[in-house]
C-alpha cells in the first residue's frame, strides 16, 4: 500500500494548485472561485525516489449545510484515511476563525499535520508565517504553490514521517484498470451511480444541478477486474453555459471522454431523451469511444412513460445501434449490477485484435452477399482488408475507386464486420484506400512507331471530317 497525503483547508486557499504542482498534472480544476473542488481527487506525488497518493479535497469550514456540508464530510473522509495531512492556509488573508476550527479538528484526528502557509509570493516568509503560530501546529512551512517555492522543503518534511511505500504499489501511469467516463446532462444522477457502483459515498451528491464541477477519477476493483471511474460535470447546451468555471468543466468532461476506454452516457428517464443527450452521444462517437447507454430514474415511470422513452431512444439514438441499453435506478440499485459486464464487453470489443486472413474472408463474404454498386459504369473493386488500429477498431480496405463508395454501403460493411467479429459496444471505422497505380507519376512517352500510328489516325480522322462537311 502507498502512503496517503490529504490536502485540506478553507475554500480557495490553493489546494488544487498545490495538488497539480505535486502530481505534475492539471487534473484538478483551478480558478479564482471559492468552492470549486467538491469531491476527492487522487493523484501520485513522487519525491526523492519515493511516492505517495495525494488527495485534493473540497473546502472545509465555510458552510455546514447543503453542498458545503457534503464537501466537509468528503474532507473528513480523506483525513480519516490519510497517513499525513497538509493543512493549507492563505498567507495573504491571514488567520481566520475557519482556520482555527479546522486546526482544532485536525488536532483531534491523531494524524501528523503539516501547516503550509500558501500565497506568500512577494511576502516575507517569516512575517507571513508568524500570523499562524497561534493555531498550535508546528513547524510552519511558507510556500507559493503557483511557483513551487518552498514545496520541496514541505515534501522533505512530509516524506520523512511517511511509512515506506511498496516498490510496485503504484505503476508509472497511476491507478490502472479500464477507464470509464460518466457523462451526461446536469443532475441526471452520474455521481449517485458512481457511489452505487463503488458501494460508498465517494463523491458529493446533492439535489442541485451542477454539484460536480471537476472530473474525478476513482480507481476500484470488482471481481478481480480493475476500473477507474471518471465522474464528470454535467454538460448543458452551449447557450446556457455562462460561467467561466462551467466552461472549464465542459472542457474537462470532453477531455475525460478522450481519456476513457468506455463511456457511460447517463440520461434522465423522467425528463426523456433530449437533443443534448444526442449531442453528447455525438461527441463520444466522434472520439471513437466504446459506449454504454444508461437510462436512469427508470423506477419512477409508469408503463406509458416507459414506452415513450423507448420510442425516443429509437428515434434520437438511431445512430447508436451498437451500444447496449440499461434501464436502472442509481438511487435504489435496480439494474446497476449488469453495467460493468457491458463495460467489460465493450472494452474487449474496442481492443480486439482482428487477424488479416479472417478479415479478408469476411470481406469476400460481404462482397458475395452484396456487391458494391457501379460508379460511372464501372464496378468498384474491394481487394483486401487489414486492421488499422484499436479503440475504436479500424478496418482498412484497399481497392479501386473506393473513394466513390456510397455511405450506405460503408454502413453495410461496418455492420457486417460488427456481426462477424462481435464488435458490439464500440464504433467500427472503415477506411478505404485506393490501390497505387505504378505508372501514375511516370510521363507517358510514346515510341517512334506509336507516334507514327497516332499521326496516321489523326490524319484519317481529319479526312473523314472534311468528307462529312462536303456532303452537307
From Swiss-Prot:
GO function terms (MF aspect): GTP binding; ribosome binding
Residues in EngA-type G domain copies: 3-166, 178-351
Keywords, sorted A to Z: GTP-binding, Nucleotide-binding, Repeat, Ribosome biogenesis
Domain spans labelled KH-like: 352-436
Pfam families from the UniProt entry: KH_dom-like (PF14714), MMR_HSR1 (PF01926)
SUPFAM superfamilies noted in UniProt: P-loop containing nucleoside triphosphate hydrolases (SSF52540)
Binding site for GTP 1: 9-16, 56-60, 118-121
Domain of life: Bacteria
Residue ranges, annotated region (Disordered): 434-472
Ranges of biased composition (kind: Basic residues): 450-472
Cleavable signal peptide: none
One Gene Ontology biological process: ribosome biogenesis
Positions of GTP 2 binding: 184-191, 231-235, 296-299
InterPro entries, A to Z: G_ENGA, GTP-bd, GTPase_Der, KH_dom-like, KH_dom-like_a/b, P-loop_NTPase, Small_GTP-bd
Family: Belongs to the TRAFAC class TrmE-Era-EngA-EngB-Septin-like GTPase superfamily. EngA (Der) GTPase family.
Quaternary structure (record): Associates with the 50S ribosomal subunit.
Functional summary from the UniProt entry: GTPase that plays an essential role in the late steps of ribosome biogenesis.
Protein name: GTPase Der
Organism: Halorhodospira halophila (strain DSM 244 / SL1) (Ectothiorhodospira halophila (strain DSM 244 / SL1))
Lineage: Bacteria, Pseudomonadati, Pseudomonadota, Gammaproteobacteria, Chromatiales
Gene symbol of the encoding locus: der
